[in-house]
């Protein structure tokens, strides 16, 4: 069966659900999908099981990899990524956040903000997300007085991480909305959330005129057709027949794009902001991996050593309790990749939690990098610093 062509009739935006494990992110994602499928006869409703679709997730009942679904409101087309909340999977949440223009923060009304709520807010801020909407979930399980306290607490947190004091808060039960899609009272919270997204989230300016760049999130092979790399186009446009370079981690190599798809539909051209799959000519699955980038030839090069300005999180923010010294070896997260690197300090003997400092980093493998790109620094399963590249050294 021939695939249909994606019709670009509404502005496209990437959003996602973030928040602590078990606060209801996947349930809300499913509730939105079911609600939108009722409004739009062409839309496919995805149940909770469809979104949480890896066997180990079903077994543990938690989301591990970021999952994408699509839906439409009256005004916009949304790609929605359901981000994992589980601590060991936060690196996949970073990949997901790297693809979002705005986020929906889920907080369970019966338990309030938890450590991961804070970590996700910090990561959202570091990944350049400017606006969030709070969804206070599990309203049916919480005492009304507690809900008021949680609301105040969450708004304080949201402000602390640089988001607006006027961030909308939507209250409801995602499980109720998912389970009773025909009941207007149950789905009212989803309706309010979607209206809020259309009105409060700004459509991002897309860098369509810059050279093409896509950070590879996943790679799979389609028998008889070749290898597909998926990810969000960061800048530029891509069409069938164009040459691209695969940059970072391994030797740079050229290939030609033989297909561009989004949500199983064919695209005339992929453009900045789209989550796409690109079919690549003559590339084996083993030749390309998550963390590399696909780019217009000659526009980005791989590097190992750079100077950066970083902010070290305090103990209260979930960071280190003790200082670090020259020779420190954490993981550096750029776009969709994480690489170990060694830190050198200039004119300083150590860096304390809470410090803003300039450091020099040498990574153990080369990755595609640009000046001003932001990154997160993690160690032992937690985010310890965030930074920005000031200058590429070699």
Curated annotation (Swiss-Prot):
Its main location: cytoplasm. GTP binds at residues 19-26, 82-86, 137-140. Residues 19-26 are annotated as: G1. It catalyses: GTP + H2O = GDP + phosphate + H(+). It is an enzyme of class 3 (hydrolase). It is found in: Cytoplasm. Residues 173-175 are annotated as: G5. Residues 61-65 are annotated as: G2. Its EC number is 3.6.5.3. Residues 137-140 are annotated as: G4. It comes from the Bacteria. Pfam families: GTP_EFTU, GTP_EFTU_D2, GTP_EFTU_D3. InterPro entries: EF-Tu_GTP-bd, EF-Tu_GTPase, EFTu-like_2, EFTU_2, G_TR_CS, P-loop_NTPase, Small_GTP-bd, T_Tr_GTP-bd_dom. GO terms for cellular component: cytoplasm. Keywords: Cytoplasm, Elongation factor, GTP-binding, Hydrolase, Magnesium, Metal-binding, Nucleotide-binding, Protein biosynthesis. Mg(2+) binds at residue 26. One of its GO terms (molecular function) is GTPase activity. Residues 82-85 are annotated as: G3. Residues 10-205 form the tr-type G domain. GTP hydrolase that promotes the GTP-dependent binding of aminoacyl-tRNA to the A-site of ribosomes during protein biosynthesis. Monomer. HAMAP family: EF_Tu_B. Belongs to the TRAFAC class translation factor GTPase superfamily. Classic translation factor GTPase family. EF-Tu/EF-1A subfamily. NCBIfam families: EF-Tu (TIGR00485), PRK00049.1 (NF000766), PRK12735.1 (NF009372), PRK12736.1 (NF009373), small_GTP (TIGR00231). This is Elongation factor Tu. It comes from Borrelia garinii subsp. bavariensis (strain ATCC BAA-2496 / DSM 23469 / PBi).
